[in-house]
Amino acid sequence: MRGNKAKIPRSINTGTYLECADNTGARTLFVVSVKKYRGVKNRQPCAGIGDMVVVSVKKGTPEMRKQIFNAVIIRQKKEFRRPDGLRVKFEDNAAVITDDAGVPKGSEIKGPVAREVAERFGKIASSAAIIV
């Protein structure tokens, strides 16, 4: 897992609802906490593209609902700037359910995936249809 070259604004707080962009059976995810987040006292943990979060499944198949998983954020609405000056933003906030190592649980990913995520998590990049 490599660091990001772009400075990603952390716009996804705990308590945010995300779309699940894979075929695991989950549809809506709820962010419980952020993995490897080191903040200060009384500051809400927040995440951006390429960060791993702990999520709870709110909508989906009965087997998936009310369960806790790790997920990687692959899209966010808040725009971010790449080192070459290009600004990128997506239509929705979306994540992919993974294990602790960052290997996706599903076999396909719906919609585009940010290039920063593809560089950081190779297994997510291999199952993505579009990398932006």
UniProtKB/Swiss-Prot annotation:
A GO-annotated cellular component: cytosolic large ribosomal subunit
CDD domains xrefs: Ribosomal_uL14
GO molecular function: large ribosomal subunit rRNA binding; structural constituent of ribosome
A Pfam family hit: Ribosomal_L14
Keywords: Ribonucleoprotein, Ribosomal protein, RNA-binding, rRNA-binding
Disulfide bridges in this chain: none
Biological processes, Gene Ontology terms: translation
Leader peptide range in chain numbering: none
Role according to the record: Binds to 23S rRNA. Forms part of two intersubunit bridges in the 70S ribosome.
Complex formation: Part of the 50S ribosomal subunit. Forms a cluster with proteins L3 and L24e, part of which may contact the 16S rRNA in 2 intersubunit bridges.
Protein family: Belongs to the universal ribosomal protein uL14 family.
Protein name stated in the entry: Large ribosomal subunit protein uL14
Native species: Methanothrix thermoacetophila (strain DSM 6194 / JCM 14653 / NBRC 101360 / PT) (Methanosaeta thermophila)
Source taxonomy: Archaea, Methanobacteriati, Methanobacteriota, Stenosarchaea group, Methanomicrobia
Gene: rpl14
